[in-house]
Amino acid sequence: MFQSCLPGALRSWSRGVFSTSTRPRLVLGIETSCDETGAAVLDETGRILGESLHSQKETHLKTGGIIPLVAQRLHRENISRVVQEALNRSAIEPSELTAVATTVKPGLALSLGIGLDYSLKFVRQHQKPFIPIHHMEAHALTVRMLHPLDFPFLVLLVSGGHSLLALAKGIDEFLLLGQTLDEAAGDTLDKIARRLSLRNHPECGTLSGGQAIERLAKEGDRLAFHFISPMGQNYDCNFSFAGLRTQITGAINKKEKEEGVEAGQFLSCVKDIAAASQHTVASHLAKRTHRAILFCKSKGLLPEQNPTLIVSGGVASNEYIRQILKIITDATGLHLLCPPSKFCTDNGVMIAWNGIERLKQGKGILSYSEEVSYEPKAPLGLDITSEVKEAAIKVPKLKLRTNS
């Protein structure tokens, strides 16, 4: 946990950080946890004054996945430009900033290091407070920038690197209800897309793996293949996608032999496999989320008025998965909120907003002279997954069908 500065260290800049002046405080957010170099300037109302984002997606599509050394090099080449663009678009000088917020955990070590090194040099040069940010906390709280939402609320975070369920009780207080035991949902969808050679598909050349699956699934028959939803007899909220990917890979291998398809060619049923894969991933996410809702209700952890499920992270951009989750929230009386797709994927805006949240409450604000380290692995909140498992809540069956 990050320690706030001692009063003596705060003296030189506390007036600006904790000022009651009517002039809005401004935070520069910097994101480099994986393969997006992002920066944004926000005021304390959540107004985006300027932002910039450099995506490495096209490079990593060509290499078949994220190579940490390549990601590091691209962050190094682009971070100065991206930050300067965000400042220029906001018409804000560094001297006008109240603080700088940067992702320091979790993520790829080499990527985190670029963002942290740049940020520490920046805050020392301009003598600005530094706010270290937990990447998953930022995803969880992004929706509060767009909607008036009080704590507590349930959060499902699904991306290429993470799949977890947590109860958000405060800006830095979370209860971890479930997490992936192997690979994340987004990683699974990306690997299935690579196995299907969707990079070469005429409809999918510029899309990420998950986006390609979603695109083709719209014209596929999800009932053409039956994949077993993982962990059906495990009454907890953890996720597991590796076994599902093995099932799907087996089906692809079988069909390739039947059709005589060689590597790089497409199966005639590629859209059906995409649809069935997407549905099974969505179903697994939905069932674990359903149990998390029932657990939270049984323990009185959700408010009676306007209980809410937030879905964020890159996979939350998938409209089909959102629709399946809406079936669960409708059945359990929860309100479903998802950030716009542009804020589901990694960006500087969510980091700046998390900095604003911390600034308002005076939490985790460090002096520019303090030493900070990045953490490639970092849990989210207090782990109560064993308590969830002990509750052994059985989830009633629901028909997970959509109109699309």
UniProtKB/Swiss-Prot annotation:
The UniProt keyword set, sorted, is: Acyltransferase, Metal-binding, Mitochondrion, Transferase, Transit peptide, tRNA processing
Enzyme Commission code(s) on record? 2.3.1.234
- Name a GO CC annotation attached to this entry: mitochondrion
Q: Where can this protein be found? A: Mitochondrion
Identify its protein family.
Belongs to the KAE1 / TsaD family.
Which HAMAP family does the record associate with it? TsaD
Indicate what this protein is called per its UniProt record. Answer: tRNA N6-adenosine threonylcarbamoyltransferase, mitochondrial
Name the source organism: Danio rerio
Task: Name the gene.
Answer: osgepl1
